[in-house]
Amino acid sequence: MPQMAPIGWLSLFIIFSIAFVIFNMMNYYSYTPSMPKSELINKTQSTNSLNWKW
């Protein structure tokens, strides 16, 4: 049964690690949460109430 050289295992590990990181980055950055407009309006009003008018 043939055996792989250590550099073969290293290159295989590096290739799969890069593929795993790219896959996770694509999944992370493709997610866009949807916020209803009513919540967006309430959020802007709540931040405006924090600005004190001295």
Swiss-Prot record:
Which GO terms of type biological process are on file? Answer: proton motive force-driven ATP synthesis
Membrane protein topology class: Single-pass membrane protein
Judging by the UniProt lineage, the source's domain of life is Eukaryota
* Localisation: Mitochondrion membrane
UniProt KW Hydrolase keyword: no
Q: Which GO terms describe its molecular function?
A: proton transmembrane transporter activity
Entry GO CC: mitochondrial membrane; proton-transporting ATP synthase complex
The question of whether Membrane is a record keyword is answered with: yes
Spell out where the chain crosses the membrane: 6-26
- UniProt entry keywords in alphabetical sequence: ATP synthesis, CF(0), Hydrogen ion transport, Ion transport, Membrane, Mitochondrion, Transmembrane, Transmembrane helix, Transport
Main function: Mitochondrial membrane ATP synthase (F(1)F(0) ATP synthase or Complex V) produces ATP from ADP in the presence of a proton gradient across the membrane which is generated by electron transport complexes of the respiratory chain. F-type ATPases consist of two structural domains, F(1) - containing the extramembraneous catalytic core and F(0) - containing the membrane proton channel, linked together by a central stalk and a peripheral stalk. During catalysis, ATP synthesis in the catalytic domain of F(1) is coupled via a rotary mechanism of the central stalk subunits to proton translocation.
Q: How does this protein assemble? A: F-type ATPases have 2 components, CF(1) - the catalytic core - and CF(0) - the membrane proton channel.
Q: Which family does it belong to?
A: Belongs to the ATPase protein 8 family.
Record's protein name: ATP synthase protein 8
**Native species:** Cochliomyia hominivorax (Primary screw-worm)
